[in-house]
UniProtKB/Swiss-Prot annotation:
Keywords, sorted A to Z: Protein transport, RNA-binding, Transport
Protein name per UniProt: Nascent polypeptide-associated complex protein
SMART domains reported in the protein's UniProt record: NAC
Gene name of the record: nac
UniProt entry tagged with the keyword Zinc: no
GO molecular function: RNA binding
Recorded coiled-coil stretches: none
Family membership noted in the UniProt record: Belongs to the NAC-alpha family.
Amino acid sequence: MLPMNPKQMKKMMKQMGIEMEELDAEEVIIRTSDEELIFRNPNVSKISARGVETFQIVGEYEVVKRPPKISEDDIKLIMEQANVDEETARRALEEAGGDLAEALMKLQE
């Protein structure tokens, strides 16, 4: 493919109904169930074509693990089964990644 200057490329994209916009983003965070991908100072492009908007994110990112979600019912169960206070039960569940059996085993050692 022949190299094309940016102005020609933009004109051609516009003729095809594709619009591209650079966004001045400071940070982008993508959250999954167990981690966050944090992009600081990314290059973000918004591409609109045929009524669909697509975002392109380019840059370095950091992966941060999210703490497990621990329900009050889980805490109460651990408190009853291991005969411990709420703080101890919560800490055991956090250390066990929310795994009830592992938290109980650690407390019963």
